[in-house]
Amino acid sequence: MADNEILQMHDLKPAPGAKKDRTRVGRGEGSKGKTAGRGAKGQTKRNHVRPGFEGGQLPLYMRLPKLRGFKNPFKVEFQVINIARLVELFPEGGEVAVADLIAKGAVRDNAPVKVLGDGETTVAFTLKGVKASASAKSKIEAAGGSVSED
């Protein structure tokens, strides 16, 4: 290419020695023929063994017991929050809904919320749209608050 010509896309090519063909094995004696890197005679020369095969030994997946029971697809998993955390987030108390907890980053909006009774409170909470354990309910009501699940 002359110095005054403009370099164009169709003129580009890889540098010499930059591209090397992959070795094609088993294509004749002159180029890795015969055993083609598979070693001498035997099972793995002729074919492959399936995943989990242990050479005829009783495989692990058959030695272990079968799984029993079932998983309930309708199980409800609650996000839990303790009274101590509620007091941290809302020190003044007042009405607390699930949306307020989501806004503060305490829970996510993908599962229902349950309040547990770890911690103490002296401020009154009015909790809306959450479940509460018996101990949490008694502590909140003792402080002058209330819990409603709707």
Curated annotation (Swiss-Prot):
GO biological process, one term: translation
Membrane spanning stretches: none
Annotated disulfide bonds: none
UniProt feature, compositional bias: Basic and acidic residues: 8-32
GO cellular component: cytosolic large ribosomal subunit
Keyword RNA-binding: yes
Region spans: Disordered: 1-55
GO molecular function: rRNA binding; structural constituent of ribosome
Pfam families documented for this protein: Ribosomal_L27A (PF00828)
Keywords from the named record: Ribonucleoprotein, Ribosomal protein, RNA-binding, rRNA-binding
Top-level taxon: Bacteria
NCBIfam families membership: rplO_bact
Oligomeric and partner information: Part of the 50S ribosomal subunit.
Family: Belongs to the universal ribosomal protein uL15 family.
Role this protein plays: Binds to the 23S rRNA.
Protein known as: Large ribosomal subunit protein uL15
Source organism (scientific name): Bifidobacterium longum (strain DJO10A)
